[in-house]
Amino acid sequence: MQQNKKLGQCFLKDKNIVKKAINAANINKNDIVLEIGLGKGILTKELAKQCKKVIVIELDKKLEIFWEDIIKEYPNVEIIWNDALKVNLKELGFNKVVANLPYQISSPITFKLLDCDFEVAVLMYQYEFAKRMGAPSGTKEYSRLSVSVQYRAVVDYVCKVSPSAFSPKPKVDSAIVKITKKNEPIHNIDNWEFFDGFNRALFQHRNKNTKKALIHSAHEINMDRDKLKELLNSNEIMEFNDLLGKKVYTLSLKEIGVLCNNLYKIINKSK
């Protein structure tokens, strides 16, 4: 069948890659597994053999021909014909996720998943995206994505996947990543909405020092630039001058959390 290019369809065909993904998730007979993207069902079938139930979310009804074949043999598979970004994932009751994600929704679906209660997610990403997700501070790949994901989860690189594992072959390499939810973040965050805006402000200027980056992108935390500059030069935040003087990409995860919480308190106090 003809793949839907608008949906970024590249169907997984390599059974060895399927096996690696399932092994990384440590699937057992008690698991309820969420899969995003049906494809031709190669991953779905293997999951169904090993777990209690598979819940598949698929947008493209043209793939129904593969679904009809699957349900005849595996009655423990349920499908939701919808856009995964529009489905209330929290209502589905899964404890694990294994999926070959459409790459154009990699970022929004990852953060949507991180808001859910699950044990582990094993996901296929574009290789460069996977590198940024697990990057440590001080590296060129360290980004807003790195910070936002690693605050909420442990990221483990499973393996690189070549274009030959898919049909049609994508123009980029891929990678399987294992995401394990943390019981507690590295540093308790007072306000997650502010934290996300704070990170956007920082990493829009990752090579600048932290104070300049925040001032340049004050709008990301709903601040007037001059007002934020005044606060960042005030005595109240003086004890964090060393952090404010560091280049953004050198800040550790904990340093970002500490600075974020204290700036949040100072801003609220000034209102």
From Swiss-Prot:
Similarity comment text for this entry: Belongs to the class I-like SAM-binding methyltransferase superfamily. rRNA adenine N(6)-methyltransferase family. RsmA subfamily.
Transmembrane segments: none
GO molecular function per UniProt: RNA binding; rRNA (adenine-N6,N6-)-dimethyltransferase activity
Keyword Methyltransferase found: yes
This protein's UniProt keywords: Cytoplasm, Methyltransferase, RNA-binding, rRNA processing, S-adenosyl-L-methionine, Transferase
Cellular localisation: Cytoplasm
Gene3D superfamilies: Ribosomal RNA adenine dimethylase-like, domain 2 (1.10.8.100), Vaccinia Virus protein VP39 (3.40.50.150)
GO cellular component terms, semicolon-separated: cytoplasm
Superkingdom as given in the UniProt entry: Archaea
Species this chain originates from: Methanococcus aeolicus (strain ATCC BAA-1280 / DSM 17508 / OCM 812 / Nankai-3)
The keyword Ribonucleoprotein is annotated on this UniProt entry: no
EC number: 2.1.1.-
SMART domains: rADc
Disulfide topology: none
Enzyme class of the recorded protein, top EC level: transferase
Record InterPro entries: KsgA/Erm (IPR001737), rRNA_Ade_diMease-like_C (IPR023165), rRNA_Ade_Mease_Trfase_CS (IPR020596), rRNA_Ade_methylase_Trfase_N (IPR020598), rRNA_adenine_dimethylase (IPR011530), SAM-dependent_MTases_sf (IPR029063)
SUPFAM superfamilies registered for this protein in UniProt: S-adenosyl-L-methionine-dependent methyltransferases
Alphabetized PROSITE patterns for the sequence: RRNA_A_DIMETH, SAM_RNA_A_N6_MT
Function: Specifically dimethylates two adjacent adenosines in the loop of a conserved hairpin near the 3'-end of 16S rRNA in the 30S particle. May play a critical role in biogenesis of 30S subunits.
Protein name: Probable ribosomal RNA small subunit methyltransferase A
Residues the record lists as binding S-adenosyl-L-methionine: 12, 37, 58, 83, 100
